[in-house]
């Protein structure tokens, strides 16, 4: 189960003041940068959309990862999302779908996807600056994403901050997210990158 908070950031110049703040810097265990590019897919009858999910093949630097997300739940004014998430490394989308059941994905959905003609919905391309944080009883990743969404020749911006629980206490994770939102006056981003891309 993926659990994350997402906030809008008006301008990438606001990334560093948050990352360098005493609140965040004291928690950092590791940090890095990823160049990401993801193609999103669905079937002609919108199987993934009907499951309130997302299917993508994403390049993370030199690694390719297929990810299936299902059944999102929302809270904290739209900032927090919790959803089923299954992923595996794979060179292409169909190989990834074949391997997703071994990662826990529903076999029936994967079988339907393999039998269908997949349609490319659109593309995201962005740079991610990530920080692995340790806070009380949880470990989480803080990420700043900056780039663009592309669909049918139309382009939209990506400029956002995410906090994703990696392990440990959900209560401590929520407490840290609330602290960050209040301290930096963050505005919730209720829509995923896929949802915003589909609105282009």
Q: Regions from the language model: what does each represent?
A:
Residues 1-200:
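Phosphate-end processing signature that detects enzymes handling 5′-triphosphorylated RNA
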